[in-house]
Amino acid sequence: MSLSSKLTVKDLSLAGKRVFIRVDFNVPLDGKTITSNQRIVAALPTIKYVLEQGPKAVVLASHLGRPNGERNEKYSLAPVAAELEKLLGQKVNFLDDCVGEHVTAAVNGAAAGSVFLLENLRFHIEEEGSRKVDGEKVKASAEDVQKFRQGLMSLADVYVNDAFGTAHRAHSSMVGFELPERAGGFLLSRELEYFSKALENPTRPFLAILGGAKVADKIQLIDNLLDKVDSIVIGGGMAFTFKKVLENMEIGNSIYDKAGAEIVPKLAEKAKKNGVKIVLPVDFVIGDDFSQDANTKIVSASEGIPSGWEGLDCGPESRKLFSETIASAKTIVWNGPPGVFEIPKFSEGTQAMLAAAVKASEAGSTVIIGGGDTATVAKKYGVVEKISHVSTGGGASLELLEGKDLPGVTFLSSKQ
């Protein structure tokens, strides 16, 4: 799947058309109050561009939360419609469902240039294809799924996907539009542009930085990246399994992944064969408790971590080593923080790495931060604007880095 060959919204002729845009308005809510409108703001460039082209109607569709395939007012998109109206400076017609005769009639009978927001797609089991009942998975029938997709399609002449965060899901609104023109919006296209640059044509040296607790969860990721990168920094809880297996380091009560430990030698062997340098921490900030009240000290890898203590961040020498490694790379993909950044006294390693990433970005290197925790870190320390690209999709970016195809991207039309 070449990421750079997909149709974008700019390739479409939109005048007089009903334009269906799959957006990601899965915003955090406190009751009916939106606590962060970031995802709505992120979709505005695509929505505004489409409106400037003189469409008949713009139909916006999204999921919100996990209503388990049934209507649940707690997950209504009504508050989003009000917020979008404010941001767009134009009336947004909120429809109380996403399919049905009254929905189709409203869209088809609209004045030119009208904007509609449909109710939560996941109020229908047919969007995800299944729901949980008493802990058991119950599938929607193929006929019902087809009918639901036809209902969505009846609202559209062209389809635009701007929901990168859901691109790894083969849901109806992602892969159900059998229309001649299916394009990526600006947000999705930007994601694809950066990931294709890194994964298909990187400027070298290419560095991957990986954190997270379990090696077993990241096997496919590490394995795929070992075919692409020049060096790889392993931090976070994962580092202890690597240090114990490869260097026989004493790790005290630090996190140890027994299943992952069996694979570490194979990964190290592959790295050696491919000429990829594995960079591990050389010292640690350890604590006698997983809290801000913990007693702490710094130990080197050769000293090891005593029993009753656990490694919760990388130490000052490791920070220096990681910063130098980052400074010498031209393409950097970072997925997972190197320490327990949520606890201030164990956040210095993460802050140092972030500072090095910003510096590299400013010096002209391409720095891509995968979604999830690492994106949270970039937001927390206010550096999103200073990094080449902070991904909006945790699961989707991870699957791309693992070498998997994303159904929502594969489904888009290719440029002729």
UniProtKB/Swiss-Prot annotation:
The keyword Mitochondrion applies. ATP binds at residues 213, 218, 237, 311, 342, 373-374. GO terms for biological process: gluconeogenesis; glycolytic process. One of its GO terms (cellular component) is cytosol. Pfam families: PGK. The keyword Flavoprotein does not apply. Its cofactor is Mg(2+). CDP binds at residues 212, 217, 236, 336, 341. AMP binds at residues 213-214, 218, 237, 311, 342. SUPFAM superfamilies: Phosphoglycerate kinase. InterPro entries: Phosphoglycerate_kinase, Phosphoglycerate_kinase_CS, Phosphoglycerate_kinase_N, Phosphoglycerate_kinase_sf. It is an enzyme of class 2 (transferase). ADP binds at residues 212, 236, 341. It is found in: Cytoplasm; Mitochondrion. (2R)-3-phosphoglycerate binds at residues 23-26, 38-39, 62-63, 65-66, 121-122, 168-169. Mg(2+) binds at residues 213, 216-217, 373. GO terms for molecular function: ADP binding; ATP binding; metal ion binding; phosphoglycerate kinase activity. Its EC number is 2.7.2.3. HAMAP family: Phosphoglyc_kinase. This is Phosphoglycerate kinase. The lineage of its organism: Eukaryota, Fungi, Dikarya, Ascomycota, Saccharomycotina.
